[in-house]
Amino acid sequence: MKQSVKAPAKINLSLDVLHKRPDGYHEVDMIMTTVDLADRIDLTLREDGLISVDVSEGFVPNDEKNLAYQAAALLKARYHVNEGVSIYITKRIPVAAGLAGGSSDAAATLRGLNDLWQLGLSLDELAVLGAEIGSDVSFCVYGGTARATGRGEIIERIASPPPCWVILAKPPIGVSTADVYKRLNVSAIDHPTTEHMIAAIEGKDFDGICHHLHNVLESVTLDLYPEVRNIKEQMKRFGADGVLMSGSGPTVFGLVSKESRVQRIYNGLRGFCHQVYAVRIIGSAGS
């Protein structure tokens, strides 16, 4: 038996970091939404009880370090599943980009194996399991649009933003999330009012959403990596309505309301950035 599952990327419309917790994680308050740039997870049952992972992208681990492998191993051990699974990941989401590609692969594996192994778990139960794998996995189990608090595992699903285009641009650099958080001084930065973003989303106020885009991690990443700052500036110059870095970077996204501007922005960015994508916000979960 086989199962194919999409694993969409996410962007942060708002990302606030409140403080470092005693357990070493940071307390966050984020608004995330999924876009229609997605990896594909192909799951094939195997009778020998083993788990294997193959990936189309050479830079992604294909062993126990892979989050999809960890998701399968967790489900198999927790629910005493005898069967194994072969996992093939077709990567479309850029790697180490701030778009939760690995977390989304893990979440898609949880959802797909829940069906394939006939476990009958709810999304809420899968999200709790996802939190054991990584902070973004719980959100990715649901997809759609949500507020994430705690270390990212407490999910409150909210309405979807109005339909719009999203331009994604990833410079050819890697960003250490741990280093960004280590350098972040939460007492010396401006913090977003997350409720304002929620109100704009629920009111389908595109201009309000663009106005309230805020990511406190930009205060670190833009100084460490001038390439990210340059992409933000160029995206604004080419005509994006709202521009923000996603996660800890280095990917920058631009929200665009008019399709007539999308190609111009895309072409302009492709002049100096190889990984550029024109996608749409998916909308509600399950779309």
UniProtKB/Swiss-Prot annotation:
Catalytic activity: 4-CDP-2-C-methyl-D-erythritol + ATP = 4-CDP-2-C-methyl-D-erythritol 2-phosphate + ADP + H(+)
Highest taxon listed in the record's lineage: Bacteria
InterPro entries for this protein: GHMP_kinase_C_dom, GHMP_kinase_C_sf, GHMP_kinase_N_dom, IspE, Ribosomal_Su5_D2-typ_SF, Ribsml_uS5_D2-typ_fold_subgr
SUPFAM superfamilies cross-referenced by the UniProt entry: GHMP Kinase, C-terminal domain, Ribosomal protein S5 domain 2-like
Pfam families assigned: GHMP_kinases_C (PF08544), GHMP_kinases_N (PF00288)
GO terms classed as biological process: isopentenyl diphosphate biosynthetic process, methylerythritol 4-phosphate pathway; terpenoid biosynthetic process
Enzyme Commission code: 2.7.1.148
Pathway involvement of the protein, from the record: Isoprenoid biosynthesis; isopentenyl diphosphate biosynthesis via DXP pathway; isopentenyl diphosphate from 1-deoxy-D-xylulose 5-phosphate: step 3/6
Entry's Gene Ontology molecular function annotations: 4-(cytidine 5'-diphospho)-2-C-methyl-D-erythritol kinase activity; ATP binding
Transmembrane helix as UniProt keyword: no
Its biological purpose: Catalyzes the phosphorylation of the position 2 hydroxy group of 4-diphosphocytidyl-2C-methyl-D-erythritol.
Assigned protein family: Belongs to the GHMP kinase family. IspE subfamily.
Database matches in HAMAP family: IspE (MF_00061)
NCBIfam families per the UniProt record, alphabetical: ispE
Protein name: 4-diphosphocytidyl-2-C-methyl-D-erythritol kinase
Organism: Halalkalibacterium halodurans (strain ATCC BAA-125 / DSM 18197 / FERM 7344 / JCM 9153 / C-125) (Bacillus halodurans)
